[in-house]
């Protein structure tokens, strides 16, 4: 079963005079099955951010089709789209996007509170998730009282607690040191393995990408190639670097820490 399906997805930005100024994404096809962990990589300006914005439903395609969990977002009205985004999607951002005025517990529970889930169920979900991610000891802390890595793990918990169809992770390790980054990627991999979370990760970091099961490479707004991971993450990491070298662009954009 495909959780995500795009067909001929394109995004063109126009000038004020109506002439084409930039073709950000061109005829892009992508299928993501339930329980997959897929990475998106490419040089700056390749179309990664545009693709993510379209999938997040904060921008609309110029043409093409996109279906998430059997629903076409473009057919939804504004209020329906906001509800769809809240229930079907989970987000993990580079800068965490946790609210400083709330505790870690309250931040994680926010999606359930907005949906008016019963308190007993909220606490049960949180208890299980906090156990899995080993963050029980920070639940009653404020965001500024915990490390960046702990904040991002809390953000991962918030992204999945409402059981979304798809989690979109945008450079989730971008603001972290290598140790914290590895912990966060282990967290996402754990959610994928144990909770069968379907995750789409956009990253420049080859090490972060090596935690995925499949990498799709974009160049100039178009599909370039894809590679699949076997049993050895180190071999997959090297395959990612090899593909990036063929892909071109500024190779120094890509963080090449060894896994």
UniProtKB/Swiss-Prot annotation:
The keyword Transport applies. This is Uncharacterized ABC transporter ATP-binding protein YvcR. Pfam families: ABC_tran (PF00005). The keyword Electron transport does not apply. GO terms for cellular component: plasma membrane. Its EC number is 7.-.-.-. Belongs to the ABC transporter superfamily. GO terms for biological process: transmembrane transport. GO terms for molecular function: ATP binding; ATP hydrolysis activity; transmembrane transporter activity. Residues 4-248 form the ABC transporter domain. ATP binds at residues 42-49. Keywords: ATP-binding, Nucleotide-binding, Translocase, Transport. The lineage of its organism: Bacteria, Bacillati, Bacillota, Bacilli, Bacillales. SMART domains: AAA (SM00382). PROSITE patterns: ABC_TRANSPORTER_2.
């Amino acid at each position: 079963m495909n959780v995500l399906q795009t067909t001929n997805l394109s995004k063109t930005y126009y000038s004020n005079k109506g002439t084409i100024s930039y073709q950000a994404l061109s005829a892009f096809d992508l299928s993501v099955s339930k329980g997959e962990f897929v990475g998106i990589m490419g040089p700056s300006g390749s179309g990664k951010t545009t693709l993510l914005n379209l999938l997040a439903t904060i921008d609309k395609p110029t043409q093409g089709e996109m279906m998430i969990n059997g629903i076409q977002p473009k057919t939804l009205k504004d209020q329906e789209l906001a509800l769809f985004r809240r229930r079907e999607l989970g987000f993990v951002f580079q800068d965490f996007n946790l609210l400083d005025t709330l505790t870690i517990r309250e931040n994680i529970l926010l999606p359930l509170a907005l949906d008016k889930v019963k308190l007993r169920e909220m606490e049960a979900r949180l208890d299980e998730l906090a156990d899995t991610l080993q963050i029980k000891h920070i639940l009653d802390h404020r965001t500024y009282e915990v490390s960046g890595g702990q904040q991002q793990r809390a953000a991962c918990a918030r992204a999945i607690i409402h059981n979304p169809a798809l989690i979109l992770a945008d450079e989730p390790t971008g603001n972290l040191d290598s140790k914290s980054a590895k912990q966060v990627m282990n967290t996402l991999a754990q959610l994928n393995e144990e909770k069968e979370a379907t995750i789409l990760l956009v990253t420049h970091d080859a090490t972060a990408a090596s935690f995925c099961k499949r990498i799709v490479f974009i160049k100039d707004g178009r599909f370039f190639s894809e590679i699949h991971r076997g049993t050895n993450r180190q071999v997959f990491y090297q395959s990612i670097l090899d593909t990036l070298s063929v892909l071109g662009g500024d190779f120094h954009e890509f963080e090449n820490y060894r896994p």
